[in-house]
């Protein structure tokens, strides 16, 4: 009987064991290929966002300065003046590496950063904040889990310092992913308990395995080249060889005029047809009761800020606008929205994060927004006028003064006068 079982399951067991050996002993040395790194940087795929190997490969290339551009779905709004297109066409001394997906917010960005901490130390980043992240209801666990993997988990566990950031991150992770691996260790961190030597040994073993697995499987991307051609190369020929904002504005304006003809909200035709028009009546007054002032997202944002401060990263924050006509149609309160922007800015500026491009009041400008809440056309040019000098003439990070009060529930739910918060 045992012999028959071995004949059936033995080969499977041996094959599985050999795969584990292959992964564990797979070489993790990085070989650079600038073309492939550009493909990955502009692909804006789930893999390029959450896999370690693709990010590290680009960010450590000595022949090109890739800069993390962190956000969510705004990066997929490609046109002739998108940041990736302008950087490539005019051979900027940097290239954006886009890290974001629809549905991702600060918590996903925090765990993604854990994979690249040595590679962002004392460098620069661009971080786009959408006030729409700051909802009263926590975002769905499924949305978080879609962009989270075991390598992010063990990277966090190796990097954590047992401080308030570690406690908050562990607590949030247990809530967003209740069946997460190494749950017992996370529970210790969430309670502020010290880890044992055995805990650290387990973390180290899992971390090495996850790194090797990322090196082996994370390098494969069949979509990267096609996406780069679609997202970047196809637009290069439309731009003048000599850089000029006036010329670029004319191109962007003509493109916008030609592609916003089927609606009076200034939205791109395709987006309006497939995302708005079919449910137009449903959207009327839809955001009347929205409140961006009370949200756990403020605490999650503090996780990211603490990490930037620890890593001495000089960050440019960009605050997105809302399409003014869309705001009026859905009855989103502009007073509430601007109050939320004020709260976000206070959390940033009071701790030394003073590089802020605030476009929250530009939502009524023609061709500034491509759909409901995302930059496009003239918005991308305004973005470039701030981002390009920030990255072309890099300065060291300021001396940040972090305030743990921003991890409190008091702050997350505060909706009063910002100046009165103690």
Put a short name on every predicted segment.
Residues 88, 283, 293-299, 304-367:
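Extended hydrophobic/aromatic segments used for targeting, binding, or gating
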Residues 74-165:
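Membrane-embedded segments
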Residues 6-27:
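Hydrophobic membrane-insertion alpha-helices, especially the h-region
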Residues 30-94, 111-112:
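Membrane/wall-proximal cationic-aromatic binding patches
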Residues 36, 156-300, 402-422:
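Secreted/periplasmic serine-hydrolase-like ester/acetyl group-modifying domain
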Residues 64-66, 94, 121-124, 310-315, ...:
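Loop/turn elements at helix/coil->beta-strand transitions in domains of secreted/extracellular proteins
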Residues 71-72, 127-132, 272-279, 318-323, ...:
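Short loop/turn segments at strand-loop or loop-helix junctions that form parts
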Residues 99-101, 335-336, 342-422:
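C-terminal regions of proteins
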């Amino acid at each position: 009987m045992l012999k028959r079982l071995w004949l059936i399951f033995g080969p499977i067991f041996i094959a599985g064991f050999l795969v584990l050996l292959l992964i564990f002993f797979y070489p993790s040395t990085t070989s650079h290929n600038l073309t492939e790194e550009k493909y990955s940087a502009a692909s804006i795929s789930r893999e390029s966002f959450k896999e370690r190997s693709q990010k590290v490969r680009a960010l450590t290339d000595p022949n090109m300065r890739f800069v993390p551009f962190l956000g969510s779905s705004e990066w997929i709004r490609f046109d002739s003046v998108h940041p990736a297109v302008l950087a490539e066409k005019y051979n900027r001394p940097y290239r954006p590496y886009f890290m974001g997906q629809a549905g991702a917010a600060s918590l996903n960005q925090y765990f993604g950063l854990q994979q690249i901490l040595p590679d962002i130390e004392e460098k620069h980043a661009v971080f786009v904040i959408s006030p729409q992240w700051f909802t009263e209801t926590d975002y769905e666990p499924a949305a978080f889990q879609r962009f989270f993997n075991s390598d992010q988990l063990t990277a966090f566990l190796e990097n954590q310092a047992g401080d308030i950031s570690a406690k908050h991150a562990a607590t949030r992770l247990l809530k967003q992913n209740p069946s997460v691996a190494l749950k017992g260790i996370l529970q210790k961190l969430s309670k502020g308990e010290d880890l044992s030597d055995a805990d650290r040994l387990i973390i180290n073993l899992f971390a090495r395995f996850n790194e090797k697995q990322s090196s082996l499987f994370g390098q494969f991307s069949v979509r990267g080249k096609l996406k780069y051609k679609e997202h970047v190369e196809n637009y290069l020929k439309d731009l003048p060889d000599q850089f000029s904002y006036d010329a670029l504005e004319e191109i962007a304006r003509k493109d916008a005029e030609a592609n916003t003809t089927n609606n009076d909200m200034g939205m791109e035709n395709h987006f309006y047809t497939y995302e708005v028009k079919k449910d137009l009546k449903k959207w009327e007054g839809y955001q009347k009761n929205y409140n961006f002032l009370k949200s756990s997202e403020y605490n999650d944002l503090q996780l990211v800020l603490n990490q930037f401060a620890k890593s001495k990263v000089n960050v440019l924050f960009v605050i997105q606008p809302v399409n003014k006509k869309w705001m009026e149609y859905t009855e989103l309160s502009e007073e509430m929205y601007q109050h939320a922007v004020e709260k976000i800015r206070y959390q940033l500026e009071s701790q030394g994060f003073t590089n802020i491009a605030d476009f929250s009041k530009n939502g009524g400008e023609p061709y500034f927004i491509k759909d409901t809440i995302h930059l496009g056309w003239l918005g991308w040019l305004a973005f470039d006028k701030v981002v390009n000098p920030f990255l072309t003439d890099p300065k060291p990070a300021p001396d940040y003064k972090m305030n743990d009060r921003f991890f409190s529930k008091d702050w997350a739910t505060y909706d009063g006068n910002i100046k009165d918060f103690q």
